[in-house]
Amino acid sequence: MLDTQIQELIIKWQKYLSLQKNYSNHTLISYNNDLKHFLEFMNYYNSDIVTMDYIKAADIRLMRSWLAKRKCDNFVTSSIARGLSAIKNFYKFLEKTAELHNHVVFSIKSPKKSKLLPKALSEEEVNISLDHIEEYGNSQWIEIRNKALLVLIYASGLRISEALSITKLHLQNLEFIKIMGKGSKERVIPWLAIARNLITEYLEKLPYELKDDEPIFRGKQGKKLQPPVFNRELIKLKRFYGLPEYLSAHSFRHSFASHLLENGADLRSIQELLGHKSLSTTQSYTKTSIKHLETAYVTAHPIKK
């Protein structure tokens, strides 16, 4: 499907994104899959092995056909937009390393993403989750692992990928955790006693020896715990207790921000805690909280009774 030169360039591109651009593992996997899909489509479109000549000759018709195929395959708008970003990134890399120029690819506009408000759980729903997450797990150490991880995410507002990257080295300071977030941006987060105590208990029960620089959250075989595995535990929880369908590890990060805002924290502080580059990203939580207040107002105001 691909000639040798392109295969070698893809490997170099992946190393470039990982080592020089410090892209997250999640982004690397997504970009790699997007490029693979694009090149498979190019192979089908031209009925021939993909060579540098075909890469260079990609025209508006091919690009639009590929985007249409993504839409027909039920890719959501955000995934289509990300796929286009991946292809543009690859072509930009080819400009630098292979002196290959294609202005058509860069002229394609990204589809507009619908602005979905982050969905937060109510405090009651969070408490139900924290109280019962230990019921899911086939051994005691996995049960306490699940609770420790969920409490850590909600107490600190971490992304699931950030929480799963925590090592013993992160735990040396009893008051703060230093996290390396998106774009290699470091932030400092208060280290609450409830999360610290649960993690200490979890490490005491963990049946595997870990080096100080190894991620502490492990799967049942002792390998680093992966987000889909933990989210499967949350699926069991939400189905049994009738919790919202959107409940996921990430919804507890949203809940962290929304509950802080509802309890008087200022936006700038929440922005720093979440590691948002732009304040406008954090402001979406204002809309969520206002919506929550509207619902409470309509339900509880005496004039409606």
Swiss-Prot record:
It is found in: Cytoplasm. Residues 116-298 form the Tyr recombinase domain. One of its GO terms (cellular component) is cytoplasm. GO terms for molecular function: DNA binding; tyrosine-based site-specific recombinase activity. CDD domains: INT_XerDC_C. Belongs to the 'phage' integrase family. XerC subfamily. Site-specific tyrosine recombinase, which acts by catalyzing the cutting and rejoining of the recombining DNA molecules. The XerC-XerD complex is essential to convert dimers of the bacterial chromosome into monomers to permit their segregation at cell division. It also contributes to the segregational stability of plasmids. This is Tyrosine recombinase XerC. It comes from Rickettsia bellii (strain RML369-C).
